[in-house]
Curated annotation (Swiss-Prot):
Residues bound to Mg(2+): 15, 17, 189
Protein name per Swiss-Prot or TrEMBL: Phosphonoacetaldehyde hydrolase
CC per GO annotation: cytosol
Alphabetical list of Gene3D superfamilies matching this protein: HAD superfamily/HAD-like, Putative phosphatase, domain 2
EC nos: 3.11.1.1
Molecular function terms, GO-annotated: magnesium ion binding; phosphoglycolate phosphatase activity; phosphonoacetaldehyde hydrolase activity
Amino acid sequence: MNYSNPTQLQAAILDWAGTVVDFGSFAPTQIFVEAFAEFDVQVSIEEARGPMGMGKWDHIRTLCDVPEIAERYRKVFGRTPTDDDVTAIYERFMPLQIEKIAVHSALIPGALDTLTGLRKEGLKIGSCSGYPKVVMDKVVELAAQNGYVADHVVATDETPNGRPWPAQALANVIALGIDDVAACVKVDDTVPGILEGRRAGMWTVALVCSGNALGLTWEGYRALSAEKLESERKRIHGMFAASRPHYLIDTINELPEVIADINRRLAKGEMPQAV
C-alpha cells in the first residue's frame, strides 16, 4: 500500500465558546472571577482570560502561578496556592459554571448557516472544549435547542491531556472515521486550541474577533470603528503569531472561504505540517 496526500478536507474540528457559541467567550471568564472571589482573592477579567483554552483545572493552576495572583492568595491564606488549593477553587468553579452557562449559550450570529453549508459540502463537524464533560453536557443540550448538533464532542476530561496537547482533536479524528489528520481543520479562538490543532497535524484557523482575544459582545464588536477594529486585529494577530495558525479570520462566518482555499492547496499537494 502506498501513501497519498488527501485532496480535500473531510472534517472541521470546532471549539465551542467564542467559536460557535458565546460571542466574546464570557461564560468561563466571568465564573473564574467569581470563583476566586469566593476565596477573597481578586482576579480581573483580563487576568482570567489569559490561559483561556486550557482545561479548567489547568487554567486555575496557571492563574495561581501568576505572581501577582499568588501574592493576593498568600495575603489571605498565608501561603501560595498548592494543587489542593487549586482543586478547592475548581470545585467551587464547577457548580457556578453549570448554574450560569445558559446565560451565555446563544449561537454566534451566522454560525448555524455557515455550518449547515459546510455539511452540504460533505464535511463532518467534530468539536472539543476546555470544559469538562459535566459542563459540556449542558452546553450541548442548550446548543441543540438552538439548532446546532455536532457530529462528535470531546470534553477536556475525556482524554489524558487537554489543550495544548493534541488528544482531544485526535479523539475526534478517530470517532469521525477520518483517514488522515491533514484532511482536518481545527478552528479555535485561543492559542492553546491552535497549538492543539498544529500538534495534531491539522490545518488551523484562529478566530480573531468572536472569542477570548477581543473579549467583546457581538454588539460591542459591531460598534467598533474601522480604525479601532484594525488596531485590535493587529494586536490579536500578534498574540496568535507564536502558535502559527494557517489562517486568521474574524469569525466562523468567514470559514467557507478558508475551506475552499485549503481544498485548493490540498489538491496541489500542500500539507499543513509543511507550512
